[in-house]
């Protein structure tokens, strides 16, 4: 792969940068799972006016441009890993919340749920022992698509100069550095971009595979 303009080995920097890029993607997915599950489970299980109110909150959150939210968080918190994680968590949980709500609305009137309630189990026990385990399949599939989305978002922010700042090293910062030397050393941009592409594609294939494996219709 060669070296950059300062003589640093590009392959080493790409491998080192993968730790931060993939970590941001995974942590964003976990944050989306926690926030989205709590929010969506509350809306789907309680229902009624609270459900309508919480869903209007999601509609408002969806109306805010993602880039604007990330820029505002970057200005308020700073251009660091913490700011990136908070910004990505704020824009990634809504889809998970809607999915969890839909699963809970579908399952909460099933006979085994009614039997659990009739046996005297608490609401928390019904949610964590019966509803969530039966709804976890589609949620896991959705989270596998959240990881590449977060990696792309972080890379885009770093690429346009609004994400991580030196000495932090991610694929986005490497691509941003490579852009400045594109005419002289195009490999500085091409190799980080290639690894971003391969990683995003791999997670998308993983999501497709999990979706097929967990879809009960494919077992017929």
Annotate each predicted stretch with a short phrase.
Residues 3-220:
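Alpha-helical transmembrane segments of integral membrane proteins
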């Amino acid at each position: 792969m060669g070296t950059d303009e300062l003589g640093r080995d590009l392959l080493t920097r790409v491998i080192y940068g993968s730790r931060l890029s993939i970590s941001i993607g995974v942590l964003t997915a976990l944050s989306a799972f926690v926030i989205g599950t709590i929010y969506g489970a509350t809306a789907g299980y309680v229902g009624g006016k609270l459900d309508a109110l919480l869903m209007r909150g999601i509609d408002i959150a969806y109306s805010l441009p993602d880039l604007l939210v990330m820029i505002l968080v970057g200005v308020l918190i700073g251009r660091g890993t913490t700011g990136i994680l908070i910004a990505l968590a704020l824009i990634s949980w809504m889809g998970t919340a809607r999915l969890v709500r839909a699963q809970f609305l579908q399952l909460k009137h099933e006979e085994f749920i009614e039997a659990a309630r009739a046996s005297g189990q608490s609401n928390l026990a019904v949610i964590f022992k019966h509803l969530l385990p039966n709804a976890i399949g589609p949620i896991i599939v959705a989270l596998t698509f959240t990881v590449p989305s977060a990696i792309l978002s972080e890379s885009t922010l770093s690429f346009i100069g609004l994400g991580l700042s030196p000495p932090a090293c991610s694929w986005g910062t490497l691509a941003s550095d490579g852009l400045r030397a594109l005419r002289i050393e195009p490999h500085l941009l091409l190799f980080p971009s290639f690894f971003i592409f391969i990683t995003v594609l791999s997670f998308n294939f993983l999501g497709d595979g999990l979706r097929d494996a967990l879809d009960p219709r494919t077992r017929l």
